[in-house]
């Protein structure tokens, strides 16, 4: 039989790879003639030849069996990408493996084998395939996907295997990751440095392998300091290409577009679509150069090779004129194999098929791996795949398209060629060559044909100089002198303009009707606080008397004093016959009247509104600086609300609130947020008109860089949560939140957040750090529902959800149906209401208080023992109490977990409420105390808090029998066919009882008796009352006829083996008890009960069970 034959044909640069065929020689039938029978002697000769052939074949098989095999794996997306599959990895690897195995100088005594490992096109699946074959192969060729190069390198290092990949970057100096080609990023940088193009864009296909390639390429470019204008990927179809073209249009100064996708020359549809779109959008007119990335990974055929996609004289042929193709150089004489060499000199019947040029890249990687393995074995490392990168230095062997050469550091050296078209033909023409040993680009004599006749403009050379700082393509050192001169001239001109403007502004500040600076000659300071009536005095004469230092002249409400001494104790003065208020700055702070501060003061001066206090000027006196504001004699809104002698009805409140909203609306229309709005800086004048004050104070301090005093926690109760968390700058939405807090104050006449009962620090912390949201509580009877809803809308957590002041103003006016409120009429109505009988009101409040007191005491006595409740009411300490003899009852529901899982939460709550209401009714007929219920657990004690001698065991035993009897007939409403199996545990002994906690205090029991009773319940069985020996002794001492059966030794957690008993009845107890299950040791009774519960629920869900009321008797268990 003929052996397997191989072959490969090369036709110039248009090379093809073979199909494999098994060629069997034609064997005709044996034809025996008389001549054969007569030649007897020939039989012996044939026999000798036959046995000799057999012995020779056997020796060859033994020799092959004795050779050690090194298996390598070829990773790649061979199964999911048709263009990658055209590389024929099986044939390429087989050719290389056969060449190695046939070379006697390579791997003597060993042989090379391979496995092709399809990885899929996505990174997770590729990494999983890589990990799955760690024990099958000794080294890897790949990966092709750079997305998992780093992970694969780390894993391979741990496994002691090497990776030979043309897609992965690796540090110099060998190791387990060996690049089989020079860095693609370095090749592109060398080409672009030669042409002087620095501004890049990278467009990739949507496939994972190409997206990752684009990202790593962009990272490499940014590492070299190059500007990357765009990194994007193509969406599906022509729409995605159109979107990318629009993005390329928008990038300023772009020169190069790297295309990370399959080349259009090899059938890449994405690149074909993108180039067609670029041609339609006019991007192929010479302004851009498109550069395919995938051709850097193989030797693309050129010369006499024609490409059909460029032979149609269509848009793609014209668009490809703007494409420069960089590919490995390919020389016909450099091919490692010819058809004769690969077939071993034998004739082969092969059918040619066009394949991807990546075929040769795979072949070279296997050859490089084989030579590294040969050197490793020569140096005594054995046939191991570890650290093969240390053995590829200074290598020079025959490759597929050119010789495989490496330098002294193991870096691959190769030659690249730049290919171009003229926009009319279908062939690629070499124009430049790049040798990676020198990284120099040399022209080959034929110039590049650029669309439009000229290449894109050069970028600044500083982009490619690692020792030069390049800012937007300009070398700063070249224009430093010009910039310095321009800056000096600009500074001189600016200083001159500044001083001239400052002088003019100083004149305006002190003269004219719009002056801002006020002096001591214009203010009169009084000894006493002014009355609500406006005094009429001659401000000019009064000012002169103060300045002259003589005896003060008599005025209406007081006398003037010497200015320096009196200013420390007053904030009120007279200015042009009107009372004014001085908002003083901190001691030692002298406002710096710089232009920004003066502009701010003029803005304040121009604000005039009846609901905003007027800013009259800035007073600077000896040791005192203050803002002069309009004075309102009735004080702040906070003072007004705290005045209990003043009754405020809704009309009065609405009038104040409407004034507040109008004033704040005016500030917001002037683009002036308040930032510190609170009821303390809302003042009321003599006509009960509310005005907003204190606006601009903090901003003025900030405008001339003066320190802003740190507010106390009580001052921050009106501040919005986003301002508490952030820098605290004034915002319009922050004022809306403050308005909502003032609304709460006015409606309730209480301080902010008073209903929480917390300190200011705690409230601020809760407001600033939700959830939960912390907001004031306002009952519906404290104001109109519409006003409360508006208030709640204003304090929304998200600032964008709060309404604007225009919306608030419109909504608030609608609350009063647009009517104007009169404060005088409101005060008259309040006086009429105040004349009503207070005695009836006091009597009504007294009766309500007594009723609430009785309710509270009754509720407290249900939650705690009466003695404990009384002590808590009196405020005395509840001391823990020791009880020497008590009996504790624990019970739970068997299968409760399964019941809960099969029921809705509301059904579980209803079922437990029905069951425990039934149990609570049983408690009334026994001397017991219910301690607590937690989930399905029910805890009762007797002998505490009221001692009952030796009756505690009997009371609990009687209770347990009653509960067991009632539980046997109990049925759930939503699953009436499911029986409720209760198990109980009893134990007697001493314990300690006391109250734990101040918030929601609980009466708790402590001691080993509690734990033992719980263990008795947890080790019991359904429809059983598990009793400890101490309880049995107490019951037998009473001699009341309790029926007790011995259970035997029971393992109790923390106790070991103890003798326990079943309480099965009592003489004279006539109620029926449910029949316990027949349970043997080791019997999985829990599974049986859970299955029964599931069956019952299934019936209930299907409507097979008859509906019953909860607690109604049903069929016995």
From Swiss-Prot:
It catalyses: GTP = 3',5'-cyclic GMP + diphosphate. Residues 874-915 are annotated as: Interaction with NCALD. Found in a subset of olfactory neurons in the main olfactory epithelium. Keywords: Cell membrane, Cell projection, cGMP biosynthesis, Disulfide bond, Lyase, Membrane, Nucleotide-binding, Signal, Transmembrane, Transmembrane helix. Residues 501-1117 are cytoplasmic. The chain crosses the membrane at residues 480-500. It is found in: Cell projection, Cilium membrane. Disulfide bonds join 121-149. Residues 541-812 form the Protein kinase domain. This is Guanylate cyclase D. The lineage of its organism: Eukaryota, Metazoa, Chordata, Craniata, Vertebrata. The gene is Gucy2d.
